[in-house]
């Protein structure tokens, strides 16, 4: 099986599933049908409390286990295809932020590969065995860009700025005529979690109310909430201020957004879609939003299949 897993700081994404980047140990065994995994004798269940930000995700096994959990979900969904196969061969496609890709790619690959040894685990108290036949590491954000690049003919532009508003960081990279510019790749430590903290503090200070991240998401997505209009209005004001500051910071980095085509990707970009439209008026340039939280995963697959086709021709 070919399986892609996007290991975000806030959410884990696979082809068919999205869940929080959080796990916790459960002392009791996983029950039949319970959403949890047992690996090396330790029981883990999903937790909405995300993992503390890790610059290097290979520091410990948590992202390995979260990835295994994502794989388990996909294996269960593909039950008819894998039934009776014993050890299931898996080609794993994962990604790293643009700023970390060059220096961490090999280490991240080895983190999952582990000499291709068979991996035994229980998911929902059901046994599985997999072996990684291959592990490919791709560049996040650029992978999402590839989904729309051909359709929108972005390769014809001299400057396309990809902005990935993620959980802890905002990753960006410049693409010129379809080619990534290695000197214009970096991360800004101002991801959407920064916005959550600002809004939480501001609302608590002015209205003595506590908004958690789900509350803020619901407000910014304009879902029905029980909060007063003044709370909603203030939340949007703070989100707009955050976005204005974020986009303004690119000029300090030597990037004039007015002279680029911007492509927004990532869950934070989707959350701020309406505000991006409102703020973008001042830039008077083209922009696109990839409105798909699983875009990176699909981009991983697109690149892998292209590599496969290329190798078959040689």
Predicted regions and their residues:
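Nucleotide/phosphate-binding catalytic cleft detector across ATP-hydrolyzing
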Residues: 1-160, 179-193, 214-217, 221-264, ...
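Ser/Thr-glycine-rich phosphate-binding loops at phosphate-binding pockets of nucleotides
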Residues: 165-171
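Conserved AAA+ ATPase "sensor/coupling" helix adjacent to the nucleotide-binding pocket
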Residues: 202-206
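Short, basic interhelical loop/turn and adjoining N-cap
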Residues: 207-211, 215
């Amino acid at each position: 099986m070919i399986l892609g897993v996007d290991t975000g700081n806030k959410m884990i994404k696979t082809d068919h599933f999205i869940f929080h980047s959080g796990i916790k140990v459960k002392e009791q065994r996983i029950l039949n049908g319970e959403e949890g995994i047992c690996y090396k004798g330790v029981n883990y269940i999903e937790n909405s409390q995300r993992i503390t930000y890790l610059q290097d995700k290979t520091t410990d096994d948590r992202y390995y286990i979260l990835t295994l959990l994502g794989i388990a979900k996909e294996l269960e969904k593909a039950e008819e295809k894998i039934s009776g196969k014993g050890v299931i061969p898996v080609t794993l496609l994962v990604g790293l932020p643009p700023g970390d890709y060059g220096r961490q790619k090999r280490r991240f690959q080895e983190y999952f590969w582990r000499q291709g040894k068979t991996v035994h685990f229980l998911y929902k108290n059901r046994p599985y065995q997999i072996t990684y036949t291959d592990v490919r590491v791709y560049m996040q954000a650029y992978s999402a860009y590839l989904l729309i690049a051909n359709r929108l003919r972005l390769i014809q532009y001299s400057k396309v700025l990809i902005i990935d508003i993620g959980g802890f960081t905002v990753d960006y990279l410049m693409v010129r005529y379809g080619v990534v510019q290695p000197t214009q790749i970096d991360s800004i430590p101002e991801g959407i979690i920064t916005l959550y903290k600002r809004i939480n503090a501001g609302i608590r200070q002015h209205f003595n109310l506590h908004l958690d991240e789900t509350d803020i998401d619901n407000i910014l997505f304009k879902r029905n909430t029980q909060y007063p209009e003044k709370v909603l209005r203030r939340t949007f004001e703070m989100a707009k201020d955050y976005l204005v500051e974020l986009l303004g910071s690119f000029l300090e980095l030597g990037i004039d957004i007015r002279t680029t085509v911007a492509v927004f990707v990532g869950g934070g970009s989707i959350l701020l879609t309406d505000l991006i439209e409102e703020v973008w008026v001042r830039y008077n340039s083209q922009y696109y939003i990839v409105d798909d939280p699983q875009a990176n995963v699909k981009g991983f697959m697109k690149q892998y299949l292209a590599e496969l086709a290329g190798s078959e021709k040689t």
